[in-house]
C-alpha cells in the first residue's frame, strides 16, 4: 500500500513538472522513464544485497527485477508459513502423546481442541465438527468454581465416579482461550495413603510396648537400687525410651502435617508465642550460649499455632544443641518487605556446603555421633519444611564452616493480620 501511494505521488509530480514545459507528453514520458529507471536501480541494489542472482550474467540492464523482488518477498512469506506449520505440527504431535490430558477451550467452556488422552480420561467423544462444552465433560461442580475462580494457587484434585484421582490445572492460554491440563494421580494418592497407614500402624505398635517398658523402668528406678552399675543402666534405658517416645511424637506430628487437609488456621499473637519459648531455651541451654531475642511485638498471624510453635522451637533447639559451645545465638522476628521474617543466627561450628541441600530430608544427620549425643532425631527440619509449605514459604539455610549458620523463613503478608484485624497489604 505504501509503495502504491509513493508511486501515485511520483506520477502527480511528473504531471506537475510537465505542465510547465512546451511539450507535455514528451516531458511526461521522459520523467516517467527516469522514475522507472530509478526504481529499477533500487530494486537491483536490493536484489544484489539479498544475493538472489542465480548466475553471473545477470546485470542491471536485465528486465524482470520487479517480479524477482516480489517473488522473493512472497517466497519469504511462504517459508515463514511453512516453518510455522512445521512447528505447530511438531508441537501438536508431541502434545498428542503426552500422558496428561490437554484441553483448549473458550471462556464459556466450548472446547476448541484436545489431545487423545482427554477423551480417554473423561470418557467422552470429541469431534471438531460437533460442539462440546467442558462442563459437560468435567461435570463436577467444584471444577466449575475452580475454572471461573480468578485466584488459582493450587491445582484442583477431583475424585471421579470410577474412583480415580484427577489433578486439574487451568491457565489463560490467550485473551480468548483457556488451557486445561489434567493428570491422573491415583497411583500417587494410593502410595501416600499406604505410607500413611504404614506409619500409623508403626506408631501404634511401638507406642504400646514402649509405654509398658517405661512403666517398668519407673518401678525399677523407685526401688532405691544401690548398685551404681544397675542405676546407670536404668537411667540410660529411661533416657533412650524417652528419646524413642519423642521420636514417635515427631513422626506422628509430621504425618499429620503431610496428610491433613484441614489447616485449622486461626488468629494468634506469634510474637507472644516466640517470647514464651524463652524459658524453654534457658532449660535447654546446657552449653552456656548467649541467647538474644529480638522480637517485634504484637504481630498477629493467621495460621496454625501448634505447628508454627513446633517449627520455631525446632530451629531454636537445633541452634542450641548443634552450634557448639558458648556461642552467640540471635533469634529475630521482624517485618520485612515480603511479610514477617523469622531468623535464627549463630556463630558456631557451621555446616559443610554438601550437607545443606539435604538438611530438610527425614532422618538426615550431619554428624551421626553428635546427633546421638544431643538426642537429635533428624525429623525437626523436615517438620519445619512441611509446615512452611502451608504458608507458601520455604526454609532458607545459609552456613559457613567455623563461622556460623542462619536458618530463616518468611510468613507472606496475606497471613499477617494488622491491629485493625485486616490483612497487611
Swiss-Prot record:
Tell where it localizes: Cell inner membrane
Please report the stretch or stretches of sequence annotated as the PAS domain.
Answer: 89-156
SMART domains noted in UniProt: HATPase_c, HisKA, PAS
Return the EC number. 2.7.13.3
| CDD domains associated with the record | HisKA (cd00082), PAS (cd00130)
SUPFAM superfamilies per the record?
A: ATPase domain of HSP90 chaperone/DNA topoisomerase II/histidine kinase, Homodimeric domain of signal transducing histidine kinase, PYP-like sensor domain (PAS domain)
Regions crossing the membrane: 15-35
**Superkingdom of the organism of origin:** Bacteria
- Which InterPro entries is this protein grouped with? 2-comp_sensor_kinase, HATPase_C_sf, His_kinase_dom, HisK_dim/P_dom, HisK_dim/P_sf, PAS, PAS-like_dom_sf, Sig_transdc_His_kin-like_C
Return the broad EC class: transferase
GO CC annotations?
A: plasma membrane
Limits of the Histidine kinase domain: 201-415
The chain residues annotated with the modification Phosphohistidine are 204
Q: Which UniProt keywords apply?
A: ATP-binding, Cell inner membrane, Cell membrane, Kinase, Membrane, Nucleotide-binding, Phosphate transport, Phosphoprotein, Transferase, Transmembrane, Transmembrane helix, Transport, Two-component regulatory system
A molecular function GO annotation:
ATP binding
What biological processes does GO assign it?
cellular response to phosphate starvation; phosphate ion transport
Write down the membrane topology: Single-pass membrane protein
What Pfam families does UniProt report for this protein, alphabetically?
A: HATPase_c (PF02518), HisKA (PF00512)
What the protein does comes down to: Member of the two-component regulatory system PhoR/PhoB involved in the phosphate regulon genes expression. PhoR may function as a membrane-associated protein kinase that phosphorylates PhoB in response to environmental signals.
What's the name of the protein? Answer: Phosphate regulon sensor protein PhoR
Q: Which organism is it from?
A: Haemophilus influenzae (strain ATCC 51907 / DSM 11121 / KW20 / Rd)
Amino acid at each position: 500500500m505504501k509503495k502504491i501511494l509513493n508511486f501515485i505521488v511520483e506520477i502527480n509530480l511528473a504531471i506537475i513538472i510537465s505542465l510547465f514545459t512546451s511539450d507535455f507528453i514528451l516531458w511526461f514520458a521522459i520523467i516517467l522513464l527516469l522514475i522507472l529507471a530509478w526504481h529499477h536501480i533500487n530494486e537491483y541494489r536490493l536484489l544484489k544485497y539479498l544475493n538472489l542472482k542465480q548466475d553471473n550474467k545477470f546485470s542491471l540492464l536485465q528486465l524482470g527485477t520487479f517480479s524477482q523482488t516480489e517473488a522473493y518477498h512472497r517466497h519469504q512469506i511462504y517459508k515463514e508459513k511453512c516453518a510455522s506449520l512445521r512447528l505447530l505440527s511438531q508441537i501438536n504431535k508431541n502434545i498428542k502423546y503426552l500422558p496428561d490430558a490437554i484441553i483448549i477451550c473458550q471462556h464459556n467452556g466450548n472446547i476448541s481442541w484436545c489431545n487423545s488422552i482427554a477423551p480417554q480420561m473423561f470418557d467422552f467423544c470429541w469431534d471438531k465438527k460437533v460442539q462440546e462444552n467442558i462442563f459437560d465433560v468435567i461435570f463436577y461442580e467444584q471444577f466449575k468454581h475452580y475454572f471461573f475462580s480468578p485466584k488459582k494457587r493450587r491445582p484442583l484434585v477431583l475424585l471421579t465416579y470410577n474412583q480415580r484421582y484427577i489433578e486439574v490445572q487451568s491457565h489463560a492460554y490467550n485473551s480468548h482461550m483457556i488451557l486445561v491440563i489434567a493428570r491422573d494421580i491415583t497411583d500417587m494418592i494410593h502410595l501416600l495413603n499406604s505410607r500413611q497407614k504404614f506409619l500409623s500402624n508403626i506408631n501404634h505398635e511401638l507406642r504400646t510396648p514402649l509405654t509398658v517398658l517405661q512403666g517398668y523402668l519407673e518401678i525399677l528406678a523407685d526401688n532405691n537400687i544401690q548398685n551404681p552399675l544397675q542405676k546407670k543402666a536404668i537411667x540410660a534405658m529411661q533416657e533412650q525410651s524417652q528419646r524413642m517416645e519423642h521420636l514417635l511424637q515427631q513422626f506422628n506430628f509430621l504425618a499429620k502435617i503431610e496428610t491433613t487437609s484441614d489447616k485449622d488456621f486461626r488468629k494468634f499473637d506469634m510474637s507472644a508465642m516466640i517470647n514464651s519459648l524463652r524459658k524453654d531455651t534457658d532449660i535447654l541451654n546446657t552449653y552456656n550460649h548467649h541467647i538474644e531475642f529480638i522480637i517485634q511485638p504484637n504481630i498477629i498471624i493467621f495460621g496454625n499455632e501448634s505447628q508454627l510453635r513446633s517449627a520455631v522451637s525446632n530451629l531454636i533447639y537445633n541452634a542450641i544443641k548443634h552450634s557448639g559451645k558458648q556461642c552467640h545465638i540471635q533469634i529475630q522476628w521482624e517485618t520485612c518487605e515480603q511479610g514477617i521474617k523469622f531468623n535464627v543466627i549463630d556463630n558456631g561450628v557451621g555446616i559443610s556446603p554438601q550437607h545443606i541441600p539435604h538438611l530438610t530430608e527425614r532422618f538426615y544427620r550431619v554428624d551421626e555421633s553428635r546427633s546421638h549425643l544431643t538426642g537429635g532425631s533428624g525429623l525437626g527440619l523436615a517438620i519445619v519444611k512441611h509446615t512452611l509449605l502451608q504458608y507458601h514459604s520455604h526454609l532458607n539455610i545459609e552456613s559457613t564452616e567455623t563461622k556460623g549458620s542462619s536458618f530463616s523463613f518468611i510468613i507472606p503478608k496475606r497471613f499477617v493480620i494488622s491491629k485493625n484485624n485486616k490483612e497487611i497489604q
